[in-house]
Amino acid sequence: MSIPQSNTSLSAVIAVDQFDPSSGGQGVYDTPLGITNPPIDELLDRVSSKYALVIYAAKRARQINDHYNQLGEGILEYVGPLVEPGLQEKPLSIAMREIHADLLEHTEGE
């Protein structure tokens, strides 16, 4: 018996394997990570607008990215992540988690 090739990702296969008919036809999925964790609503409580959040997070993500790029050169001009980064976690996700944990000071308009 051969198994047909498919473009279905492994996570989708796992979700199907975890299907529980008693849940009303809903599959069981892991908690999403990245841009949805921490929740955007909780991040918006820490700034005045969604636009301020975008600028704030983008500036911090750029600092984190520059920090990683400078490690090989021995230059430590920028502060690295203030939270423990996950495996292959993007700088923007790290910045969002730092904002959520109130680890940064920010003055809007800078």
UniProtKB/Swiss-Prot annotation:
Promotes RNA polymerase assembly. Latches the N- and C-terminal regions of the beta' subunit thereby facilitating its interaction with the beta and alpha subunits. The lineage of its organism: Bacteria, Bacillati, Actinomycetota, Actinomycetes, Mycobacteriales. It comes from the Bacteria. It is an enzyme of class 2 (transferase). GO terms for molecular function: DNA binding; DNA-directed RNA polymerase activity. Belongs to the RNA polymerase subunit omega family. Disulfide bonds: none annotated. Its EC number is 2.7.7.6. Keywords: DNA-directed RNA polymerase, Nucleotidyltransferase, Transcription, Transferase. The RNAP catalytic core consists of 2 alpha, 1 beta, 1 beta' and 1 omega subunit. When a sigma factor is associated with the core the holoenzyme is formed, which can initiate transcription. InterPro entries: DNA-dir_RNA_pol_omega, Pol_omega/Rpo6/RPB6, RPB6/omega-like_sf. It comes from Mycobacterium leprae (strain TN). It catalyses: RNA(n) + a ribonucleoside 5'-triphosphate = RNA(n+1) + diphosphate. This is DNA-directed RNA polymerase subunit omega. One of its GO terms (cellular component) is DNA-directed RNA polymerase complex.
